[in-house]
Amino acid sequence: MVWGLFPVDPLSGEDKYYIFSKGIYKVGRKGCDIIINKDKGVSRIHAELTFDATTVSTSRRNKSSSDTSSFVIRVKDCSKYGTFVKTDLGTKDKVHELSNKEKILQDGDVIAFGTGSAIYRLSLIPLVFYLCPSSETFKVDQPVQDAVSSIGARISPTLSEECTHVLLEPRMQVNEALINAILAKKTIILTNWVMLLAEKSICSEIPGYSQYRPSVMVEEALVDVLELNVREKCLEGFTFVLEPTDTYRFGCSFPSLLEVCGAETVTIEDISSMSQDSQFGEINRMICVIPKSAGDKFGRFKHLSLLSRVNEMDLVCAVFSGNLPSTSLIPPSVVISSSCSTDETVVADSEAEEEETTSSVHMIDATEKAETPEKPAAIVIEDSPVTILEETSNLNEFKSVNLLADTESRGHMDEKNSSDSVTIRRDRNDEAETGKSEIIYTQDLIVRDLRSTRKVQSTGGEGVVDFKRFRKGNVTCGNSFSSLIPFAKDPYKEYDSWDVTDFMKEEKKRKQMEAIAEDLFKTEKARKRGTAGSIRGFLSGS
């Protein structure tokens, strides 16, 4: 057992003391094991506390239990102003008046040192450890047993209510015993923590658990076990939809394991009968738990199709680590209806890469159709370097369109040739000012370059359309002048070069006349100034 000496007044500023091993501890001023600064009447060495191992239990709280590792505690007065002990029975003894100036202390006794300002309570801190077995043949190591006995603690063979800590070995595989420790809300630490206590005799605080968190194996994943206060609220706000408990690895303990962490559980039968405005919360907070052994069978229920899913073992990892990452959640499946598919592909205007700078297509009219569907027809614009073949109902028959920009006449249809093709002529003014054309491609449209020996096909070996094999038109890409200035094909055409020349001549002549006038003005002004300065000018002026 660990003993504690705590100040009765927590606001006094005095330290707490924890005693882990037997020995003699001095009480007094600076340099002693237990330092008292509040009372000026405390001597340099005021008293001595002696802890001896005994087979007799010193705890009044559990008189029926016999503990082989308890202590007998005695206080001896060595001061001038005395040491006083007040028991739970109400008696107050002056230690310096007793025989040998000693008194045996028990759990709950109040000790006053000096004039009575420094008052402490002796308290028993029970430490009962349960070593979680990693296998059926697990045995406690002898060094661990010795460390537990040296601090006055003991090891419980089973996980009971009196157990204060659960000790684990590093990288232990998760089993039923560990799940029961989580359900019992016990502090889970490594066995090294007990070894640390055994090395100490007295300290002002019990060592923390942060550096002694165990790591457990959940199948192949290594998970750190966090503190109880972190685990108990890690799943708060979630409602988990469960299959029958026998389909999960930990059986009936699995729903309780989730509830210990703040979550709610509901079975498939319960959620089938409840309404949308149920007490289980919003639908986006409900998650279906997929058993590892049975797999995902929630798809057979239509009302569960919009719920996210999580694997059973991922949820077990969240219970130990105190965190359910969003990456562990499996989003619901989205059904895409057949109406999303299209029969035609429309290619909007885009900046196509220039394949050949020597050729350009000013306009493509792909909306023309053949007059007779039975016989393939073609629309030809003379001397075109590009041919577009459009597949008809028969995969072996194609419609051919030859393109060329005619700059001489207005667009119209003038004749039909012997091959049932139609020649279309269009004027340059009819084309779009941007210099680009709108082309509507159907599903089976093929673009071919007649000057290139390489064949470009839009269908694969199985008749599947391959849109990536289209060749882009010869349109200037980037910030071309026609794109930036669409309102003027020839920006200098609207200015008359002769008018500009005449204007420049007149402007030059005007500046010359101004310069001459300025020179004459300055000359006349200088002459008058010289005349006025002379005596002759002054006399002639008078």
Swiss-Prot record:
It is found in: Nucleus; Chromosome. GO terms for biological process: cellular response to ionizing radiation; DNA damage response; double-strand break repair via homologous recombination; mitotic G2 DNA damage checkpoint signaling; mitotic recombination; reciprocal meiotic recombination. GO terms for cellular component: chromosome; Mre11 complex. Disruption phenotype: Hypersensitivity to the DNA cross-linking reagent mitomycin C. PANTHER family: NIBRIN, NIBRIN-RELATED. Belongs to the Nibrin family. Component of the MRN complex composed of two heterodimers RAD50 and MRE11 associated with a single NBS1. This is Nibrin homolog. The gene is NBS1.
